[in-house]
């Protein structure tokens, strides 16, 4: 039962406000002794020209409902105190009946392409790529839970001037045998060396540009090298995606749109939107805005041209209701321009394009940069995380049967959870030892809580009945109330494209359950044993589902 909705329904019978407005106004009192929900009468005071405290008193006197132990006016608020036993009973019934579908909703429908991860070919996946990958993956899972059809697109950086640089670098310093032995490490080494040498000899940049131009013009040798670099890189990326448990519906990268850009340029020209500026072709976006660069002075294409082609292709291919781009905050200007150009072209659906920005991962307070080579490789981080998890499992539970698999789930899950528990826009510092701890605000803490719940259920070894699931103690109520909040948490996370809402919720539910575990003798044989076990089972169901929405596995033993 949705107790907040019950409050909305009761208040709406007494006041002349739409239910949506009432729902937005309802608050949670900071002091639990004041009740569980509060309706403020300030909005009505403006309409009725009456003291809000008198309005609150009037409403409270007219409402009664046996789902609440008290409904009373406190100053300008109407406070509602839920009947604890009824909330516990109703919530446990809902969770145990709906199982992993608890929290499923129909908030929308239709295709939602999500442009995410998108690493550059021939460079190792770094911690920077982790953010776009796991944020996009979690948003996809959450949108699916509320009715949409997500389409995960890995818009590979498999084209662009960097390939001219890489081809030049490979010809100068490369060697086929080394690349075959360890493709990514060596290709990346050539790329870094190119930038180091180009700082001393700027002519190298011209050579790189010339090589890219040959690639664009279909030079056979250049294309052969480019295809090889792409193939060996993709094999490496897919190995890491498998570790993370992330899959994609499309790998159409930048190169896929090579033959789709000219029609965009032609359309811009036909619609009179292209202007010349210092030899380049641009779309003017108004006095206060920088123009959108479409073609360089040498006629070669730019990111904007390609992204316009991609946006038009995705609309035609998927007829999307929303299109999301999970990319760093530094690209905000680019996506703003993309929407503005599409709008000028007459495509009103551009309003449904959303950039989902995120902050930086730092290490020791320093930004990670590929070009300078001071980059933290994601592959190594995941290996180290699994190794740390393995050490802790060895200490805590040396007889665990499937140690390797659990260490993988805990180590990789710890890295993913740590990323997602931070507000999407926040920058955060990454310290692996903190991340993989079994205590504190970590993924392993949530996983361990779920494993603890599973252990209790194994010990009890009882079939849980749906009869009489009422519990009256404060510890049970705190857990059940948190469980009851899960659908609203899912809704909020999906609307704000904010996985941290789910991660913070999972931590909060874990803390409440662990307090319950410390204060209640769960396995005592009495007439409330069944209800207590139902609470344990419901907690495990919701924790497992919350972790799934974050892309984290929930081992049953740890």
Swiss-Prot record:
The lineage of its organism: Bacteria, Bacillati, Bacillota, Bacilli, Lactobacillales. Keywords: Aminoacyl-tRNA synthetase, ATP-binding, Cytoplasm, Ligase, Nucleotide-binding, Protein biosynthesis. Monomer. It is an enzyme of class 6 (ligase). Gene3D superfamilies: Arginyl tRNA synthetase N-terminal domain, HUPs, Isoleucyl-tRNA Synthetase, Domain 1. Signal peptide: none annotated. It catalyses: tRNA(Arg) + L-arginine + ATP = L-arginyl-tRNA(Arg) + AMP + diphosphate. SMART domains: Arg_tRNA_synt_N, DALR_1. GO terms for biological process: arginyl-tRNA aminoacylation. A motif ('HIGH' region) lies at residues 119-129. This is Arginine--tRNA ligase. GO terms for cellular component: cytoplasm. SUPFAM superfamilies: Anticodon-binding domain of a subclass of class I aminoacyl-tRNA synthetases, Arginyl-tRNA synthetase (ArgRS), N-terminal 'additional' domain, Nucleotidylyl transferase. The keyword Lipoprotein does not apply. It is found in: Cytoplasm. It comes from the Bacteria. The keyword Amino-acid biosynthesis does not apply. InterPro entries: Arg-tRNA-ligase, Arg-tRNA-synth_N, Arg-tRNA-synth_N_sf, ArgRS_core, DALR_anticod-bd, Rossmann-like_a/b/a_fold, tRNAsynth_Ia_anticodon-bd. Belongs to the class-I aminoacyl-tRNA synthetase family.
